[in-house]
Structures are given as structure tokens and as C-alpha cells.
């Protein structure tokens, strides 16, 4: 933390300039990357400092535990894989419409300074939709979520009934990158992959008028 604060103190203006340039570039992009893959053919060697790892008996449980022996420091060169290639892109949409049922999603958008509007009246609109064709779910929880991955969708155009108060999120705004990387289902850290839309995955019976 101290190193980061010192760096920002000395380079704050350059960081802000780079960030503003990135926002401007993204605003003008029509095709947006949403997933990446590591290029293992490209790497650089860096110096890594650590301590030898050993197993020792725990005074609490009596079982073995991992222990880093600070009397045995080491330094060695290791490969650092810091090159990634775009794996999948999407065409940036004009906007997203989020039904009111997903207020948790909208709250997180607002907390991240996304400008959100609401429809003033009921509307039937021809819009592009996604159908979830496949996905994988982790068997173990992470941060309280059973994350989805390798999500595959197909798009289709359909007339949809929207209600007054449904949320409208335009992509022509400084937070556009966050908007797209969370609302595109196939994006690595999308709200779909973080389980916020799991309600759509179960088969439901339509209401009975009795």
C-alpha cells in the first residue's frame, strides 16, 4: 500500500491522463473484447524472492501445516506470463434494458458510477436478446458464489414488453467498459457468471387464472 501511494503521489497526473485516454478510446470502439487467453509463448524472466516452504506440526490442531521458514530465504528467476490475446469480442450495443426484478444488479451499477435511467412508460420494443445455450458451474463456492464459466449464448431479435420503471443503461458513458463487461453474459466477470441471473435458468410454469 505504501509503495502504491508513493507511486501515485509522484505519477498521479500521468495515471489520470492514461485513464482518460483509455476511456476516450473505449468510447469510440465498436467491437469490444470481453474474454482473453494467456499467450504462454511470450513471457519475461523476473526475480522472485521467497522463503522455503516446509511442513510442521500445528500447536493448535496437532496436524501438519504449511510454514514458510524465514531463516531460509531464496532468490530465483521465474517466468512471468503477462501477455494476453483477445479471445472473444462483441459489438457494443446502444444500450441495455434491465427488468426491475434485478435491482441487485442495478445497485451495483450505480455504486460503480454507471448512469442509469428508467423507462417512463410501458413499451413494446424490438430488441436483441440472448439465449443461454451452455455454461459450466464450479462445484465449489468462491466468495459465496458458485461461479459460471465458458458461457455460450446465441442472439436473436424479438419484440419484448417492457414496463414503466425498467432500467435503461446507455453505453455512451465513461463507465461503458464496466457496463459491457458485467452485462454481457459471456464476459468473464459478468453478472450472469456471478449468479445474479440464476433465476432464469430454472423452468417455470406460467400462471393459472383460477
Give the location of each predicted region:
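Hard-cation-handling environments
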Residues: 1-127, 131
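Catalytic centers of hydrolytic enzymes
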Residues: 108-111, 117-118, 134-210
Amino acid at each position: 500500500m505504501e509503495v502504491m501511494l508513493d507511486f501515485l503521489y509522484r505519477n498521479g497526473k500521468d495515471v489520470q491522463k492514461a485513464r482518460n485516454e483509455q476511456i476516450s478510446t473505449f468510447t469510440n470502439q465498436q467491437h469490444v473484447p470481453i474474454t482473453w487467453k494467456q499467450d504462454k509463448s511470450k513471457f519475461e524472466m523476473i526475480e522472485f524472492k521467497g522463503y522455503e516452504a516446509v511442513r510442521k506440526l500445528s500447536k493448535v490442531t496437532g496436524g501438519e501445516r504449511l510454514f514458510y521458514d524465514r531463516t531460509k530465504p531464496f532468490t530465483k528467476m521465474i517466468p512471468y506470463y503477462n501477455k494476453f490475446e483477445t479471445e472473444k469480442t462483441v459489438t457494443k450495443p446502444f444500450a441495455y434494458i434491465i427488468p426491475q426484478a434485478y435491482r441487485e444488479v442495478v445497485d451495483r451499477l450505480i455504486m460503480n458510477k454507471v448512469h442509469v435511467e428508467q423507462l417512463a412508460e410501458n413499451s413494446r420494443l424490438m430488441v436483441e436478446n440472448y439465449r443461454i445455450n451452455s455454461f459450466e458451474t464450479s462445484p465449489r463456492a468462491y466468495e459465496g458464489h458458485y461461479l459460471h464459466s465458458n458461457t455460450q449464448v446465441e442472439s436473436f431479435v424479438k419484440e419484448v414488453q417492457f414496463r414503466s420503471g425498467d432500467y435503461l443503461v446507455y453505453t455512451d458513458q465513461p463507465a461503458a467498459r464496466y457496463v459491457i463487461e458485467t452485462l454481457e453474459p459471456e464476459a468473464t466477470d459478468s453478472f450472469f457468471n456471478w449468479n445474479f441471473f440464476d433465476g432464469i435458468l430454472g423452468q417455470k410454469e406460467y400462471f393459472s387464472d383460477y
